[in-house]
Amino acid sequence: MKQIVCIQPHEMALVDVPKPTIQQADDVLIHIKRIGICGTDIHAYGGNQPFFSYPRVLGHELAGEVSEIGRNVEHLQVGDLVTIIPYVNCGQCAPCTAGKTNCCTNIQVIGVHADGGMGEYLTVPSKYVIKTNGLSLDDAAIVEPLSIGAHAVRRANLTAGESVLVIGAGPIGIGVARFAKLQGATTFLMDLSEERLNFSKNWTDADAVFQPSEQVLDELREKNNGQLPTIVFDATGNKHSMMKAFDYADHGGKVVYVGLVKDTISFFDPDFHAKEMTLLGSRNATLEDFQYVIDSMQNGSVKEGYVTKKITFEKTPEYFQQGDFRTNKAQITLEK
């Protein structure tokens, strides 16, 4: 079968490899049909992704069709359309036993710690495979990135009536903003790109959008009844943005890091203390988040149009080499 391998930073190749087979009784062989390209893949290609080694097959935002199942698999059958939870957990560490499988101490993320889905077929344990019958393949492949946003909102313990600023109007950030809106929050978005802000305001139904400026704190207060937001989500993965995020939260507020940066973050403690702020990290997502996102997509709460660029499988190495990642969300299609 065909497979795309990131051999080392800035080097990607289309290769021929043997088709995977069922190895365990609970395995599922999936014919991959859609692959989302996300910041993790882009950072890995550029050599800036933590928790990473080469060579590596990227791809963890996946949709496909069940091609074969192991003898113990009961909830799936050949022909089912599915998506994949790419966070393979040990099930035995303290976080896992507490239900926090998304931050398992021994986690193996498909496409990061283990080879991913940038190929024609992938074998996955059945407990990480979710039926998406009723969703298009395009939509099934965006369940994972949207689940990241949904998890961040749940992690923040957001309640209706709160005000939220999401910094970074990329694929993860707009998911955060949309699910915050669905929870009853007043939502604001901030990004350097006017194009992204125009798209995200419509897609998320945000109350207002901003570009960073010296006046942005006053602009936020003007749009938010004189107050700064109670929760600030940073989805940029940018060190300077993540440190600046503290400035935008009101006293008693929260800052949630949804993005990840391979660097040290610092802040001025007297300001942090004076505001009695809460700083939270949000990592990956759980089965609960995936099911919530699928339900939201099925009931129409999530709009169409999240994917803004389509790429053929064979053209994927060329897309990475060109390095133009300004589109909101790119997706690889393997359908003939």
Model region roles, listed by residue range:
Residues 3, 163-164, 255:
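Conserved hydrophobic helix-helix packing surfaces used for dimerization/oligomerization
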Residues 20-35, 48-94, 133-135:
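Glycine-rich beta-strand-centered segment in the early N-terminal region that forms part
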Residues 90-167:
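NAD(P)H dinucleotide-binding glycine-rich loop of Rossmann-like/cofactor-binding domains
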Residues 135-214:
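Mid-domain Rossmann-like dinucleotide-binding core that forms the NAD(H)/NADP(H) cofactor-binding site
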Residues 193, 261, 285:
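Residues in the short beta-alpha loop(s) of Rossmann-like NAD(P)-binding domains
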Residues 198, 203-278:
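Glycine-rich cofactor phosphate-binding loops and adjacent beta1-alpha1 units
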Residues 243, 287-336:
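C-terminal hydrophobic helical "lid"/dimerization subdomain
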